């Protein structure tokens, strides 16, 4: 039997994708670098006739129908290049290699070009949803060689999550576009998680609410505008107690791991000149969390903060303020993420459909939320507008939330609570809507010490001037 698709890499994600494909009627050949994993997987599912395992890479490739479609679910970086190199002797022009791991988008750009020269079609595919999503329907973000997309679309769109009958999978763009969109997804995920943590910290440390009480609040919020996968599971995490009745959250060390995709998003934003302040703040917050011993030492040296504000007489009013702060900050986080996608689309000539990306994230992935429907509708109504902040719905939402948002941020800072992303969000909002900022002084200083010149606000853009700040005190146009 020749199978529909082959998959290399039988870790959790790879195995669950295979089972998902089989559930949807596709036959799958599997291979793993360590043959024991292949044998164990086949023993675990002995009745799946559509599942065939191989210990020889050549036999694995020869088992596939032409054009061959081979999906790599392995560690990003050198292992991907090594696997591609090992496969090439057995492939023919028109065969497809699919990298479904968390690869850096520029690596995917390079691989796409290198393999095209050899006649092999390459796809760099972002997959979100974790173990559960891979098994029952992930969000899939395919990019790479467009000739390969029609060959794999029936498989990917069958196994992807569905929302209102639409698969959370559609063509993203050429080269590294798929992996880039996945990286931005992960950056937004970092921001979402950090914002939820900061809201939890305020409710816990300022209002002195228990984990169980906060879980109840989040469960209610999940029925409102904040409805999302992350709010739902945050409520579940906070609610769970161990056999002794202690909330499990109270036993978890406050040190957060990361795999690097959030950092990639932050670095690319810096390289592209996009003010991704909230997501960068979320990445830095994870770095700071890893300094556990230093934080403990600092806590001993700088104990307590005198409260500037008294506890509210009606906590429910302040809880509503925190809700507004979280929702408004979430809008800013997504606005920044989509701004980055818009800039990358222009820079790399990808032609990204931002509304379609919002739909792809609507189900199956970690940041899935009802919120994304609104984003999709906004981009569908005005595709040229890449800023959520200018969309009518979000303009109204930000104005409605603003006072509670400000009260929350001021109260938290006054109480000495760390809120890097809530603060970054409102600072961005204020900076974004400031027509005449204080940054004129920064450019004046640059001209003073480095003769970097400046534009004048009473002259056309593109004219540059320099002032002799020390000697003649005169100004001249230099270009």
Swiss-Prot record:
Q: Which residues bind substrate?
A: 102, 128-130, 185-186, 190, 259, 286, 446, 452
Respond yes or no to whether keyword Oxidoreductase is given for this record: yes
Q: Which InterPro entries match?
A: 6-PGluconate_DH-like_C_sf (IPR008927), 6PGD_dom2 (IPR013328), 6PGDH_C (IPR006114), 6PGDH_Gnd/GntZ (IPR006113), 6PGDH_NADP-bd (IPR006115), 6PGdom_BS (IPR006184), NAD(P)-bd_dom_sf (IPR036291), Pgluconate_DH (IPR006183)
Query: Which Pfam families has this protein been placed in?
Result: 6PGD, NAD_binding_2
Q: Where is the active site?
A: 182 (proton acceptor), 189 (proton donor)
At the top of the EC hierarchy, this enzyme's class is oxidoreductase
Disulfide topology = none
Q: Which GO terms describe its biological process?
A: D-gluconate metabolic process; organic acid catabolic process; pentose-phosphate shunt
List UniProt keywords, sorted A-Z: Gluconate utilization, NADP, Oxidoreductase, Pentose shunt
Residues that hold NADP(+) according to the record: 9-14, 32-34, 74-76, 102
Catalytic reactions of this protein: 6-phospho-D-gluconate + NADP(+) = D-ribulose 5-phosphate + CO2 + NADPH
Name its pathway: Carbohydrate degradation; pentose phosphate pathway; D-ribulose 5-phosphate from D-glucose 6-phosphate (oxidative stage): step 3/3
Does Oxidoreductase appear among the keywords?
yes
Summary of subunit composition and partner proteins: Homodimer.
Similarity comment text for this entry: Belongs to the 6-phosphogluconate dehydrogenase family.
**Name by which UniProt lists this protein:** 6-phosphogluconate dehydrogenase, decarboxylating
List the taxonomic lineage.
Bacteria, Pseudomonadati, Chlamydiota, Chlamydiia, Chlamydiales
